């Protein structure tokens, strides 16, 4: 007899806020990415802090010093846990991601569809690398699926980017 899969219907984020002090000032393309990532994240995600019991949860993301802060709370605002993660593993990935994003946003205005597609494939590859790194850094702390990691990586990039 196999163990039944856990019911994760309540293990999700219902609201996300970004620390205003941490947000890098950026252009409309980056702000658009941030808004889409927050919307998509709240619509569909898996987010289960280890040992916290069932959600749903709210998440406040910020940068404090040299660390990424995940302030996790219950829907009613009761604190669950705050995780501080080193930014070091993300620095190169975020830098590469924004370099290729700049190329992508320039290309969509002037380049051929083949060139745009090639740049976009590279952009998605770097984004996937950042998402996997985030999943690894949260292992044993918060269980997330890959799509949730992708959306969270977008938000981390927006916070980290100082344009």
UniProtKB/Swiss-Prot annotation:
UniProt cross-references to InterPro entries, sorted A to Z: UCP032146
Domain of life per record: Bacteria
Disulfide bridge map: none
Pfam families, per database record: UPF0262
HAMAP family, alphabetized: UPF0262
Similarity comment text for this entry: Belongs to the UPF0262 family.
Name the record gives this protein: UPF0262 protein Rpal_5021
Organism: Rhodopseudomonas palustris (strain TIE-1)
């Amino acid at each position: 007899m196999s163990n039944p899969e856990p019911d994760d219907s309540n293990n999700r984020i219902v609201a996300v806020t970004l620390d205003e002090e941490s947000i890098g000032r950026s252009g409309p393309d980056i702000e658009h990415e941030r808004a889409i990532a927050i919307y998509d994240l709240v619509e569909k995600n898996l987010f289960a802090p280890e040992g916290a019991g069932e959600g749903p949860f709210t998440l406040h993301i910020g940068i404090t010093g040299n660390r990424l802060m995940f302030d996790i709370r219950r829907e009613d605002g009761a604190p669950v846990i705050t995780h501080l993660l080193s930014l070091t593993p993300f620095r190169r990935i975020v830098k590469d991601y924004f370099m290729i994003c700049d190329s992508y946003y320039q290309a969509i205005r002037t380049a051929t569809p083949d060139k745009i597609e090639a740049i976009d494939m590279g952009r998605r590859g770097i984004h996937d690398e950042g998402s996997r790194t985030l999943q690894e850094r949260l292992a044993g702390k918060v269980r997330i699926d890959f799509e949730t990691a992708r959306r969270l990586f977008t938000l981390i990039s927006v916070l980290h980017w100082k344009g």
